[in-house]
């Protein structure tokens, strides 16, 4: 795609114009594309800024609109709105994956559909708009594009999909087997509690409890993700599954 057409398509998709076109170019450049290319900028620093701008805009919006909600309630709603899965939903709505510059290897392994890559691009795009047009325009852009997610968060209709996140991370290095095993359940039928463990490559990586099997599996996946991070087994190259 020619560069002029690229910018026009992206601006049309986002319904916004950029004064500095290079900002959106950088926002849509994955680090894998820049490897070995001297002087090519990629979007990781912009992700950092975009994350902060998004948090501020959503915080201000919730604070002004929902005056009766407590600090704890507002914090919980914000975390749902700005979580990776919500950003992924926005990215899919834009179909932004097709515009991302990435290495052939990243593309072959499903990079254009990867939750983390798409979510990071949304943050980088927000940063690009903020740098190019300032806070007021960025806030309006965020509210316009996140309004459905904000509404779902207020209605408690957002579920954090930790299982998908765990699967994407551990399978970066190949088709590594993940298994969720129901350990036991207890309590009456109307208030039954389920206990689940998750195994990655036959290693127990996390456990979770919930009032449905699905909830207990999500909590087990969340526990596994926390352990992978804290034990430094999770990194950009994948996960060490050889430990016993």
Swiss-Prot record:
Which cysteines link up through disulfide bonds? none
Q: Name one GO cellular component term.
A: cytoplasm
* Origin: domain of life: Bacteria
Which cofactors are required for activity? Mg(2+)
List, alphabetically, the HAMAP family matched: RNase_III (MF_00104)
A biological-process GO annotation: rRNA processing
Q: What's a single GO MF annotation on this record?
A: double-stranded RNA binding
Q: What does this protein do?
A: Digests double-stranded RNA. Involved in the processing of primary rRNA transcript to yield the immediate precursors to the large and small rRNAs (23S and 16S). Processes some mRNAs, and tRNAs when they are encoded in the rRNA operon. Processes pre-crRNA and tracrRNA of type II CRISPR loci if present in the organism.
Gene name in the database record:
rnc
User: Is the keyword Heme assigned to this protein?
Assistant: no
Which InterPro entries does the UniProt entry name for this protein?
dsRBD_dom, RNase_III, RNase_III_dom, RNase_III_sf
Q: To which protein family does this belong?
A: Belongs to the ribonuclease III family.
Quote the record's binding site residues for Mg(2+): 47, 120, 123
Query: What is the annotated quaternary arrangement, including any partners?
Result: Homodimer.
Pfam families for this protein: dsrm, Ribonucleas_3_3
Q: Is Cytoplasm there in the keyword field?
A: yes
The record places domain RNase III at: 7-134
Indicate what this protein is called per its UniProt record: Ribonuclease 3
Subcellular location, in the record's words? Cytoplasm
**DRBM domain span:** 161-230
Q: What does the record give as the active site?
A: 51, 123
Give its E.C. classification number: 3.1.26.3
Q: Which reaction does this enzyme catalyse, per its entry?
A: Endonucleolytic cleavage to 5'-phosphomonoester
Sorted alphabetically, the keyword list is:
Cytoplasm, Endonuclease, Hydrolase, Magnesium, Metal-binding, mRNA processing, Nuclease, RNA-binding, rRNA processing, rRNA-binding, tRNA processing
């Amino acid at each position: 795609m020619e560069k002029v057409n690229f910018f026009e398509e992206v601006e049309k998709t986002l319904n916004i114009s950029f004064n500095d076109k290079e900002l959106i170019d950088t926002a849509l450049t994955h680090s894998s594309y820049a490897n070995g290319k001297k002087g090519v900028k990629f979007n990781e620093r912009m992700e950092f800024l975009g994350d902060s701008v998004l948090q501020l805009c959503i915080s201000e919006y919730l604070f002004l609109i929902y005056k009766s909600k407590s600090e704890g309630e507002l914090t919980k709603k914000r975390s749902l709105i700005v979580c990776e899965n919500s950003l992924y939903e926005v990215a899919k709505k834009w179909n932004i994956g097709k515009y991302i510059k990435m290495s052939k290897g990243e593309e072959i392994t499903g990079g254009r559909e990867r939750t983390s890559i798409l979510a990071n691009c949304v943050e980088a795009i927000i940063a690009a708009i903020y740098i190019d047009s300032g806070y007021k325009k960025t806030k309006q852009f965020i509210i316009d594009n996140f309004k459905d997610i904000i509404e779902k968060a207020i209605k408690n209709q957002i579920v954090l999909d930790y299982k998908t996140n765990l699967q994407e991370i551990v399978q970066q290095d190949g088709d590594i087997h993940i298994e969720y095993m129901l350990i036991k359940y207890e309590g009456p039928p109307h208030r039954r509690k389920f206990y689940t463990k998750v195994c990655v490559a036959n290693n127990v990586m996390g456990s979770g409890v919930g009032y449905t099997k699905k909830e207990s599996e999500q909590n087990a996946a969340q526990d596994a993700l926390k352990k992978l991070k804290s034990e430094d087994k999770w990194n950009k190259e994948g996960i060490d599954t050889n430990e016993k």
